[in-house]
Amino acid sequence: MTSTSPCLATNVPPVTAGIIIIGDEILKGHTQDTNSFFMCKKLRSIGVQVNKISVIPDDIDIIAGEIAGFSSRYTYVLTSGGIGPTHDDVTFEGVAKAFGEKTFPHPELVSLVQTFFGKSESWCPEMKLAQIPVSSRLNYGTDKRTGDCFKYPLVSVGNVYVFPGIPSLLEKSLEGLDHLFRNDKTHFHYREICVSADEVAIAGVLGEVNGRFRKHVSLGSYPDWSNNYFRVLLVLDSHSEAHLEEAHKFLIEHLPPGVVVPFVKDPVTQAAAQVYQLAHSGSPLGDKVAAALKTLEEALDTYSLEKICVAFNGGKDCTALLHLFHATVQRKFPDQKDKLQALYIRIVSPFPEMEQFMQSTTKRYNLQIYTIQGYIKQALVELKVEQPNLEAVLMGTRRSDPYSRTLTPMCLTDPDWPKYMRVNPLLDWSYRDIWDFLRTLFIPYCILYDKGYTSLGSMENTVKNPALRFTTPAGAESYHPAYKLQNEEEERVSRK
């Protein structure tokens, strides 16, 4: 990873910030810090350049030293954490020491503590929230959603602003007080370029761009080994839109031919528009998509969302099905906020990469996952007991799957099975159709498919497909990704 910072030719001095994350729990790995990410993104959007992030323990002397140093170097200092009623909440004491002050019970905060907690004794733990440095200012923000004034203020001393450590409170506070930091004289502009080549293959071009434009434009190069569609994300950043566009044009013109990927960053949010556009394209794939959407729409006309779930185990077919289902719901019920229901029949010894993909997909599509161990028939028996409201299950079955040639788009389970309507929108899709659909719309799929696997089961019965094996120029054995398989009949030869 490389990144350069521009020495911008401008008469306007930059407005800068330093962020201090305070908490033993962060340093010990007990809690993941998300506050610095939010603050960096928010501050940059209002013209403030974050120059440094520091994570320090709940120690008064360390807090004081870090704040004193940051306060002298940056326009603003934002701290997060260490505010509360317990012994390790010592941020206010650290701030006071940084400025050579004492803390005292601020009358306004004492009154607020009494109102919120019903406590008035000076020694009670809650009253520690009212004990702040003597030169403190109280900043009351406004909830931008409701227009209501915050009941509890943000404390600041000089150019130091003391935010809570709880992410929801910090985010609400910074949003409601962003006028304290807003810099309308500076606007940051950036462009992203997704590249399918490895970093080493474009290093020379990046060096040339940096040499030409670094005075006005910063260039960052960030490898992403887990992305299905690109290997490196290039980010151009500048205060000057004109310089940014000049650098962007030069870089595009000098990168190797064919390596720039027209990547769609968030295909889920745009699912309905993109999927239905493809369905109306008149292409062979578009016709398959249109037929699948028709089946899904008929299912949604017959069953309410509360009675439908999608069978999802992370494979390529059900990933395509999930995206189609999400798009259909998004189009049919644009105001629908409830989670889509999904059945995950978890096999023995699943690949860790598949488990990770399941987790990320659950979050990406806002799913309510019902996880059941074992084989499909027994899983449906358990599902009927645990979720008796469900009546239909969407399946990613294709006619090329075992025992599937006589199925119809909507058919009941066999008499000796739990009673469900099986909805099969992908019956007439081929292996190539699945991959064309996923990759045309830049839909994320399990990374194992990029490593030579074409059909995924458990770690015990699945190997890389030998039909995808090749030898690199250096003589090493490697595998093409699954979407490059030429003979579809070889899809399952890697399953034992």
Curated annotation (Swiss-Prot):
GO biological process: FAD biosynthetic process
Pathway where this protein functions: Cofactor biosynthesis; FAD biosynthesis; FAD from FMN: step 1/1
Entry GO terms, CC: cytoplasm
Flavoprotein is among the record's keywords: yes
InterPro entries on file: FAD_synth_MoaB/Mog-bd (IPR012183), FLAD1_M (IPR056596), MoaB/Mog-like_dom_sf (IPR036425), MoaB/Mog_dom (IPR001453), PAPS_reduct_dom (IPR002500), Rossmann-like_a/b/a_fold (IPR014729)
Top-rank EC class of the record's enzyme: transferase
CDD domains for the chain: cinA, FAD_synthase
Keyword DNA repair: no
Reactions it catalyzes: FMN + ATP + H(+) = FAD + diphosphate
Cofactor: Mg(2+)
Annotated spans, Molybdenum cofactor biosynthesis protein-like: 18-109
A molecular function (GO) term: ATP binding
E.C. designation(s): 2.7.7.2
Region (FAD synthase): 307-464
Location in or out of the cell: Cytoplasm
UniProt KW keywords: ATP-binding, Cytoplasm, FAD, Flavoprotein, FMN, Nucleotide-binding, Nucleotidyltransferase, Transferase
Function text: Catalyzes the adenylation of flavin mononucleotide (FMN) to form flavin adenine dinucleotide (FAD) coenzyme.
Domain-related comment: The molybdenum cofactor biosynthesis protein-like region may not be functional.
Family of this protein: In the N-terminal section; belongs to the MoaB/Mog family.
Protein name, per record: FAD synthase
Protein encoded by which gene: flad1
